[in-house]
């Protein structure tokens, strides 16, 4: 047992720590490998920024200002974690249409995101041609994707094979929903990746619904990760609403691929908080009670609590971050809406190559 003096000193130290916490957050525990306090706070900011971009997209759609929106609410932790597990400027991302958080965490700006939604002429992804969230930013290592479900998985595996053949230390991250795993091209890509031992990480963001089809009606096994064994590489499951847990799993898979040890299938168990897209109504296949229960799995307050428990953030800092993110989204919206749309003169741009033939 401690002496009265030791107990008093411990009490005073605790009180002092409480005062420090109220004035400025202090790190009280060791942090995950590769993540500093500043990086963790930045990851939280990216999650909040994505949520506000998502909310704005659906509001603009309901106002008739943009034609379509796809939500990533409930996926933010898995996507941001995956982005930070990669080596920025070296590793490639082959995303799918629900990857707003991944894009915003890997170099896409809110202005660029909103330009895409408004389909403006100077939209950097496709000059207003593609569906929203069909990213293509080669200079930031974000590959163009296809609207055909799971087609991009085969493309990504081909990229990974090319990097291996060139002996480049590059890892390719390919993301998709569990609905994609019912497509033939997904299985072709997995089989090819296993045979050729390519440096790829497959990230399945399993939100349990392929539009309106629940997982139990599209899979005979409980987990997507269970399928990896048939292709000769590991399958790992993680809680996709836990950003730190997901980071650890994806980071390990990335480093494994970089060392030449082959593919990994990571299944992040997430949830979809809203309808599939702005053209869907989830109340036709989900009960209001089911939808309300999902709020308890929200990754943003969960990560905020984790950061607060470790002295990395406090309520004031959280409020300031949300205010900053909201201002950034407001600016992006006003700026993007004011940009000119494509005209007939732009019809054949990006169709034919320009410049000398030689």
Ranges and model annotations:
Residues 1-78, 84-85, 268, 274, ...:
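Conserved acidic/glycine
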Residues 40-42, 86-87, 128, 259-261:
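A generic structural signal for short, non-catalytic loop/turn and secondary-structure boundary residues
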Residues 52-55, 59-196, 214-220, 225, ...:
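Cofactor-binding active-site loop characterized by glycine-rich and histidine/acidic residues
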Residues 141-338:
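Glycine-rich ThDP/TPP pyrophosphate-binding loop and its adjacent helix/strand module
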């Amino acid at each position: 047992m401690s002496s009265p003096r030791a107990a008093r000193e411990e009490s005073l130290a605790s009180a002092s720590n409480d005062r420090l916490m109220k004035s400025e957050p202090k790190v009280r525990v060791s942090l995950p490998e590769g993540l500093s306090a500043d990086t963790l706070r930045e990851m939280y900011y990216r999650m909040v920024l994505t949520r506000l971009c998502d909310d704005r997209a659906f509001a603009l759609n309901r106002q008739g200002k943009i034609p379509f929106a796809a939500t990533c609410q409930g996926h933010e932790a898995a996507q941001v974690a995956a982005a930070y597990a990669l080596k920025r400027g070296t590793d490639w991302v082959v995303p799918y249409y629900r990857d707003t958080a991944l894009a915003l965490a890997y170099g896409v700006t809110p202005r660029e995101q909103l330009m895409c939604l408004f389909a403006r002429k100077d939209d950097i992804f496709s000059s207003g041609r593609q569906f929203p969230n069909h990213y293509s930013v080669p200079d930031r290592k974000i590959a163009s994707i296809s609207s055909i479900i799971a087609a991009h998985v085969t493309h990504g595996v081909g990229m990974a094979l090319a990097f291996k053949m060139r002996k480049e230390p590059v890892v390719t991250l390919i993301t998709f929903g569990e609905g994609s795993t019912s497509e033939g091209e997904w299985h072709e890509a997995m089989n090819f990746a296993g045979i050729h031992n390519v440096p790829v990480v497959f990230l399945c963001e399993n939100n349990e619904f392929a539009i309106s089809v629940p997982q139990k009606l599209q899979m005979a096994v409980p987990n997507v990760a269970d399928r990896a064994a048939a292709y000769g590489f590991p399958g790992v499951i993680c809680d996709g609403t836990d950003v730190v847990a997901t980071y650890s799993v994806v980071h390990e898979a990335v480093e494994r691929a970089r060392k030449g040890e082959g593919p990994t299938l990571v299944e992040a168990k997430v949830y979809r908080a809203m309808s599939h897209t702005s053209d869907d109504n989830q109340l036709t296949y989900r009960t209001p009670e089911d939808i309300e229960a999902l709020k308890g799995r929200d990754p943003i307050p969960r990560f905020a609590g984790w950061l607060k428990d470790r002295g990395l953030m406090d309520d004031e800092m959280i409020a300031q971050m949300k205010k900053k993110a909201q201002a950034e989204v407001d600016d992006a919206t006003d700026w993007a809406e004011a940009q000119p749309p494509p005209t007939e003169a732009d019809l054949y741009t990006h169709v034919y190559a320009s410049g000398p033939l030689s």
